[in-house]
Amino acid sequence: MAPLRFSANVSWLFPELPGLPERLHAAGRAGFKAAEVAWPYTESPQALASAAQTAGLRLVLINTPRGDHEKGEMGLGAVPGRQAAFREGLEQAVLYAKALGCPRIHLMAGRVPQGADRAAVKGEMETVFVENLKHAAGVLAQENLVGLLEPINTRITDPQYFLDTPRQAAAILQKVGRPNLQLQMDIFHWQIMDGNLTGNIREFLPTVGHVQVAQVPDRGEPGSSGELDFTYLFQLLEDEGYQGFVGCEYRPRGDTVEGLSWLRSYWDRRGHPRTGQ
């Protein structure tokens, strides 16, 4: 089995540094060959592309814009009445992805509207999401890009988020039926919502285009204490033939580089793979 390929999520890692270009440089110095950025839109794509190139990094994932952050929006894909804004945000994300050479975009579903009952609006929100995803799949296909759906847990992180379980996301992907749309598996969220990680990984991995990791419940380094045995989980991903990237989307408990001892141990044991696509 090939060793896993890890990417530094510089929206989370290196918080001791002020900006995304500085964090990209730090990720390269720490040994990463790939990086991801949740929201790159505060920087010009040219500045980010230059920083990534200087750092020897391949950018592998960005998110669509949040929407109106002051109004509490966290993505727009499933939000009724915000279809035009979702499509505008998608266009912006595609421009960034092309400029950065980034092959994947997380298509954020968004939150259940404030004051609405989740059960009452679920059908309408799913209909909006499916329509938006069909549109997005066509736009992305023209640029040879992949769109990702990420369930975010509603127990701890975001109680209002619409898409919260892998089964819900997989069912929506099946309704959309586009090969360039895939699952984004954040093991932190999946553990909190469903547990049963071995079964869920084996069931859903064929449709997974990207993985992210953090310890549960504090969202710290995989090497920190918590519910998850990452030695086992990394081996499981290898055994199941996962060939995508594993994003380090966690909250460092202290100095980021010191906290990467778990990853250095993995590289010492399994080798440092080429990044590829």
Curated annotation (Swiss-Prot):
Keyword Zinc: no
Disulfide feature: none
Keywords assigned: Isomerase
Protein name: Putative hydroxypyruvate isomerase
Family, as annotated: Belongs to the hyi family.
Catalytic activity: 3-hydroxypyruvate = 2-hydroxy-3-oxopropanoate
Known EC number: 5.3.1.22
